[in-house]
Amino acid sequence: MNVTLLIPARYGSSRFPGKPLAPINGKPMIQHVYERAALAKGLNAIYVATDDERIKDAVESFGGKVVMTGADAASGTDRIEDAITQLGLADDDLVINLQGDQPLIDPISIEQIVELFRRHPGEFEMATLGYQISDKAELDDPKHVKMVFDNDMYALYFSRACIPFGRDVSEYPVYKHLGVYAYTRRFVHTFNSLPLGRLEDLEKLEQLRALEYGHRIKVAISAFDSPEVDTPEDIRRCENRLKVD
């Protein structure tokens, strides 16, 4: 099975312009993401998918590979499809979509999501990761997307609200979504051909489109958290974590 990992990265974030190039312990964030992904076993290639020459130059300066995408990509998945079309991937090739703002991603988590497809060929078209919440402050924080899944580890729903709801969740595990996806090249095209979902539009969560149109998402629970960098304040937390790692 051919496995290509793509890291979509854009410069023009409204909350944090230039985020992929933000320095973390002396390296641009995109370099941390790329280098941690490169430690994962079982990948055939890694590319940063971007439309920005500054990001391209930064990635190439540390020896990374880049595929330039169009500036009109409406979403990360649109950028992914543009990239895999340029790369000429086959329909059954596996694509890993790792967000460019996850400098703390553990390579074992990437291996875990690849292994799902190796163990269950043809059973599903899309997979993702979850992590059990230990910080109660994250339960009601819409920045941390919560998820529920069935007994066979297929996603039932994703929400910015706390799900499942309970008057006392202290002894009930609640899981958050980690922004790593795996899918076949064929399914990326299928996904992008679907109209915007109502729930997707309401929650502003792209993965809900797959569920709304009846596509199953397999879930693996990671032992490692991978917090995303959304604001400059998150950089300091990442720096402290990386020093410990």
Curated annotation (Swiss-Prot):
Pathway: Bacterial outer membrane biogenesis; lipopolysaccharide biosynthesis. Activates KDO8N (a required 8-carbon sugar) for incorporation into bacterial lipopolysaccharide in the Shewanella genus. Transmembrane segments: none annotated. Belongs to the KdsB family. Keywords: Cytoplasm, Lipopolysaccharide biosynthesis, Nucleotidyltransferase, Transferase. It comes from the Bacteria. Its main location: cytoplasm. It comes from Shewanella amazonensis (strain ATCC BAA-1098 / SB2B). The lineage of its organism: Bacteria, Pseudomonadati, Pseudomonadota, Gammaproteobacteria, Alteromonadales. GO terms for molecular function: 3-deoxy-manno-octulosonate cytidylyltransferase activity. Its EC number is 2.7.7.90. This is 8-amino-3,8-dideoxy-manno-octulosonate cytidylyltransferase. Pfam families: CTP_transf_3.
